A protein has these predicted regions:
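Short linear motifs embedded in intrinsically disordered, charge-biased segments
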Residues: 2-5, 11-19, 24, 30-53, ...
Length: 351
């Protein structure tokens, strides 16, 4: 509701004269629907923000922040975090993740989110909302009104797949699947003799490669993931360069011909650069806390512990010849950290 929007803007201390300007932009707004038989009659638009307006994201985030501050105002909700604090939600615009150690707490936050959202004209999409239980316990479903939320083993959030078991392989397989589909759609280009090798490689690096390694900075590294990424990468390069297995071209020679590195080496460099950003954050930022945080509740299963991103980064630091504390100090100098990562990556590529 737009009237709710102006009231919320006022609570955030935005001067009345600016609110009046915002209001004037939305006054008497109308549109029509274009069909194959012509345009419909004009009708008024009384809700929502304007599409394409540079103010729209700002106004929408004001509303989301207003809702979330009231939905999770109870400081006892959420999961135990550092310094006696609790983490109850992670938000990216309207993509919201609610976190809780108890079923009751999660149901309460969901109810509050729905209640305050409806007051300003926003409703939770029951079809798009999923639940995930971390651990072996079973709980009744979370409800939104009369609708029961489905519990899933993994779900997609901000383009990445989150697994109940905390496995990276689910996301890696999904990224490779999407990249393979993209690569296949461009096969006429790869087969064309009229397009130079350099142009094909530029297309591969600007279209297929980013699809493959999207969010790879957050992946842990295992032998299986490394092999899966490199196999896909080499298969694509052999197709682009027209190299058959009958030609007996080694992987090392293939990389020299393509003037590229193994995909895993690219992922390692991206992860190290990303880690530098995290290490530079203030101590209270959730991303900074997450790389050193250990849950106080729960019990690990018997057997070998699963590898984590933290362990992967420690291996990166060992390869870079650094300890955690010295890495945090070095990362504060952005230029110095970038040069260090580039130097280690070039040395790894030669090896």
């Amino acid at each position: 509701h737009r009237e709710s929007l102006w009231k919320i803007a006022k609570t955030y201390g935005i001067p009345e004269k600016y609110i009046n300007i915002f209001r004037s932009l939305y006054r008497n707004s109308s549109c029509c629907v274009k069909t194959r038989h012509g345009n419909t009659i004009m009708f008024d638009i009384l809700t929502g923000v304007r599409q394409g307006c540079i103010l729209s994201p700002f106004l929408f985030l004001l509303v989301i922040d207003y809702i979330m501050k009231r939905a999770v105002k109870d400081r006892s909700l959420g999961v135990e975090w550092s310094g006696g604090n609790r983490l109850a939600d992670l938000d990216f615009a309207d993509d919201i993740a609610l976190l809780s150690c108890t079923h009751t707490g999660l149901q309460e936050m969901t109810n509050e989110l729905g209640k305050y959202g409806e007051k300003v004209g926003l409703r939770i999409s029951c079809e798009k909302t999923k639940g995930m239980i971390i651990g072996e316990h079973q709980y009744p479903p979370i409800t939104i009104g009369s609708h029961c939320i489905e519990y899933v083993e993994n779900f997609q959030y901000l383009g990445s797949y989150i697994s109940r078991a905390g496995e990276t392989e689910v996301d890696v397989r999904a990224r490779i699947g999407k990249a393979a589909a993209t690569f296949e759609r461009l096969r006429p280009i790869w087969r064309s003799g009229a397009i130079s090798k350099n142009l094909k490689m530029r297309l591969y690096q600007s279209i297929v490669l980013p699809t493959t390694i999207y969010a790879s900075e957050t992946w842990k590294q295992t032998a299986g993931i490394t092999n899966r990424l490199n196999v896909f990468h080499r298969r694509c390069l052999r197709t682009i360069l027209g190299i058959s297995w009958r030609d007996h071209v080694t992987n090392e020679k293939l990389m020299m011909m393509a003037e590229m590195r193994d995909l895993q080496d690219i992922v390692i460099e991206r992860r190290r650069r990303f880690a530098g950003h995290i290490l530079r954050l203030p101590e209270e930022r959730p991303a900074k806390v997450a790389i050193t945080w250990t849950p106080r509740m729960g019990r690990r299963k018997k057997g070998r512990p699963k590898k984590t991103w933290r362990q992967t980064f420690r291996e990166d630091l060992d390869e870079m010849g650094m300890a955690w504390n010295s890495a945090a100090e070095t990362a504060n100098d952005r230029v110095k950290w970038r040069k260090l990562v580039a130097r280690c990556s070039s040395r790894s590529g030669r090896n």
